């Protein structure tokens, strides 16, 4: 019932427009369905696992935002079920129910952008499935399952790089289990080998497939070489400010639930069953905290990596508190108190989020969560592109809105689907600008989109964006394109198409300009 309730909320909001990360994964998944290695047309820091999951979802349910979010609904439900199984095996059925409910609630929250199908949802799904399978393998002494658990940990890494930390946790947990019993060095070594071989297998297959496509150099540069810059770009002071900006907001969306989880963190001090599981829960907590801290960006959806262990701690609090009351001979009314307090905390969180979860339509939800980001407008722009281009045409988006490529079913004239690397403070920025200019000029896209919205650029002040990229943009558009439409973003977005766009002299604070190639 818990899974069904939260699935119904997600289903109501399935048509929320894709945000830009979703747009990237959806476009890459679309390319995979066409038999194209996404790194050929998408320069991305992300590993290909989530794009492959998107391809599967799009192939099953259709190529639109609703399909993506129905896929997320199923992934979230499966994750909740595996968390129920883990917590039940660890702390009992009551803990399992509370854990599943907590995860379903917290992972839906707007403060972690839980309605968007971010890679972190897929990392968590494979990680918790792997954890459940690893515990099953060890409890039932089924060595072959350790290899299968390793494969799942490897897939968690392929969804997004921080997923590797869950594999590190698995190694530590396996070692802890081995050392807590009569030592069998050979058996432990075999178990390590099975786990690591399983984790390496999907990664090796991925590298072989990309190498065969001829795009391994591009893949390696973006996902490993250039990622080193990205992962060290935020100073510690700025990272702490980002944590203070996003962390408290997340907690205040479900304060009662987070307090219960905090109580669960202390449970090993006052409950024997929680004490027996302390290495499992608290080492997983440590790894999850490290996972959300990598790079010090602390973006809202990064916190999804923390939610499984927070949910386990909430389950531990309610279950262990009930167990302690039972052992002290409490009355039936007192025995149900921990569960009732948890239900009250859940209901209060739902009430605090009632506008987004129960009242707003999908477009309103997008505007409420993402503010001036042009995600609803991207859909309209893409429809115009699709109606006025042919299937084999290419387009270019000068802005960080890859969802336009996905919606329009048109391929990108350049691999730079985000402008951020081009305008960040990093050694490759000017070189990347020149590369993008060359790719666009060589492709001569049929339509070009210029996104004049700050969140689509976020330029560093000391990068040569005005001198190089924007100067070229103005000249290139003037020489080769004519205005086809404008999305004027104000209190309510106003769209102007065709000849009317040429006559429009009252641009809004934020605008998206659509240009078509001049006839030769």
What are these regions (language model features)?
Residues 136-154, 183-189, 193-197, 276-286:
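Short hydrophobic alpha-helices at membrane interfaces in multi-pass membrane enzymes
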Residues 128-148, 178-182, 257-277, 318:
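Membrane-interface transmembrane helices that cradle and orient dolichyl/undecaprenyl
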Residues 165, 289-290, 295-337:
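Hydrophobic/aromatic-rich transmembrane helices and adjacent perimembrane loops
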Residues 145-161, 167-173, 201, 285-294:
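Membrane-interface alpha helices of multi-pass inner-membrane proteins
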Residues 166-200, 265-272, 312, 318-330:
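Perimembrane helix-loop-helix junctions
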Residues 70-94, 98, 105, 129:
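Transmembrane-helix motifs of polytopic, lipid-linked glycan transferases
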Residues 16-18, 330-387, 401-408, 425-426, ...:
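Membrane-proximal, lumen/periplasm-facing interface regions of secretory-pathway glyco-
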Residues 149-151, 164-168, 358, 371-424, ...:
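Short periplasmic/luminal acceptor-recognition loop of GT-C membrane glycosyltransferases, typified by
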């Amino acid at each position: 019932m818990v899974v069904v309730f939260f699935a119904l909320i997600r289903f109501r909001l399935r048509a929320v427009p894709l945000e830009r990360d979703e747009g990237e994964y959806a476009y890459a998944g679309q390319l995979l369905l066409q038999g194209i290695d996404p790194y050929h047309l998408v320069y991305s820091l992300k590993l290909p696992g989530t794009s492959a999951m998107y391809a599967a979802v799009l192939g099953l349910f259709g190529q639109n935002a609703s399909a993506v979010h129905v896929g997320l609904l199923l992934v979230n439900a499966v994750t909740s079920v595996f968390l129920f199984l883990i917590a039940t095996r660890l702390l009992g059925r009551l803990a399992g129910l509370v854990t599943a409910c907590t995860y379903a609630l917290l992972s839906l929250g707007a403060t972690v952008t839980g309605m968007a199908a971010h890679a972190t949802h897929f990392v968590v799904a494979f990680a918790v499935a792997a954890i459940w399978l690893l515990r099953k393998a060890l409890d039932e002494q089924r060595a072959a399952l350790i290899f299968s658990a390793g494969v799942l940990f490897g897939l968690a890494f392929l969804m997004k790089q921080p997923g590797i930390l869950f594999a590190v946790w698995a190694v530590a947990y396996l070692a802890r289990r081995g050392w807590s019993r009569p030592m069998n060095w050979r058996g432990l070594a075999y178990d390590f080998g099975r786990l690591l071989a399983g984790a390496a297998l999907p990664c090796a297959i991925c590298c072989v497939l990309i190498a065969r496509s001829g795009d391994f150099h591009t893949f390696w540069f973006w996902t490993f070489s250039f990622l080193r810059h990205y992962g060290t770009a935020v100073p510690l002071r700025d990272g702490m400010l980002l944590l203070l900006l996003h962390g408290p907001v997340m907690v205040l969306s479900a304060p009662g639930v987070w307090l219960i989880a905090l109580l669960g963190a202390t449970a090993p001090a006052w409950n024997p069953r929680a004490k027996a599981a302390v290495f499992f829960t608290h080492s997983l907590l440590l790894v999850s905290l490290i996972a959300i801290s990598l790079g010090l960006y602390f973006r809202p959806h990064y916190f999804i990596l923390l939610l499984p262990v927070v949910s386990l701690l909430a389950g531990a609090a309610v279950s262990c508190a009930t167990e302690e009351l039972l052992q002290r001979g409490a009355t039936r009314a007192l025995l149900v108190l921990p569960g009732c307090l948890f239900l009250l905390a859940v209901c209060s969180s739902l009430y605090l989020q009632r506008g987004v979860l129960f009242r707003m339509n999908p477009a309103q939800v997008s505007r409420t969560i993402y503010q001036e980001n042009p995600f609803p407008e991207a859909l309209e722009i893409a429809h115009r592109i699709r109606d006025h281009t042919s299937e084999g045409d290419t387009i270019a988006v000068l802005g960080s809105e890859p969802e336009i490529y996905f919606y329009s079913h048109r391929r990108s004239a350049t691999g730079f689907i985000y402008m951020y690397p081009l305008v960040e403070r990093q050694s490759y920025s000017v070189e990347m600008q020149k590369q993008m200019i060359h790719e666009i000029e060589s492709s001569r896209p049929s339509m070009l989109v210029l996104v004049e919205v700050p969140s689509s650029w976020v330029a560093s002040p000391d990068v040569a964006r005005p001198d190089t990229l924007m100067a070229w943009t103005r000249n290139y558009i003037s020489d080769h394109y004519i205005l086809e439409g404008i999305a004027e973003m104000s209190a309510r977005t106003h769209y102007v198409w065709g000849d009317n766009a040429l006559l429009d002299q009252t641009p809004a604070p934020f605008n998206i300009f659509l240009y078509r190639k001049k006839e030769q």
